Amino acid sequence: MLPASPATIRRDITALEQAGKIRKARGRIFLEDIRKAPSYEMRDAMHDEEKKRIGKAAAALVREDDSIIIDAGTTTLALAENLRDRSHLSVITNSIPVAYTFNATNVNVFMCGGMLEDMALVDDDAVAFFASHQVEKAFIGASGVRGITGLTVVSPFQFAVKRQMVRSAREVYALLDESKFHIMGVNLFADFRELTGIITSKPITNERLLERLEQEHVKVIYTE
């Protein structure tokens, strides 16, 4: 063991805690599970320009008088920011940031109840809320893409809500920055056959995935 002063140890512990590798509680140090998804704040700062372009492209699909679902997430939030000036639009969401984006606008916002997890409301109440609605379009985020199968999410609580969102819309669009195609994910909540389209920023290079999307008639929309 290499010698280290108490000040050095405290400084290293603080750095590890700030990096999310450990947490302190009651005088003890615990390793964090590095497999869990990054926090909302961390995700919000990642791929920012990409998300803005995706949000703008998704907004072009929304018509006046549409009723839409906007999923929780930082990429879907970029869509909401592009819809603030719309009128006669109804938005159903489980996202606190999305709902707040439409504060003092002419957009009608309906928000579910539920347990708060990572700035999203989830649990059986949230699932039941979305089951009671049918909309024209749903705009969904994801933690990752599982091969040529479908979309995944880390949280089992968000899995159930996202699953119901997909069932509650006539058209379903996945908003995915390029990094999501390199993350396998845990809980599969949507098969590609259930999607109307994917909005992403860079060309998909996986030939097998492109073949599957073409087979299922899933539109791939690339941003400018």
Residue spans for each PLM region:
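Short, active-site-adjacent cap segments at secondary-structure transitions
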Residues: 30, 75-78, 99, 146
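Residues at secondary-structure transition points
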Residues: 42-49, 53, 74, 86, ...
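Short beta-strand scaffold positions
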Residues: 70-71, 93, 200
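HTH-adjacent hinge/linker in prokaryotic transcriptional regulators
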Residues: 1-69, 80-88, 102-107
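Generic beta-structure capping elements
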Residues: 32-34, 73, 112, 142-143
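Conserved phosphate- and dinucleotide-binding cores of soluble alpha/beta proteins
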Residues: 3-5, 18, 97-224
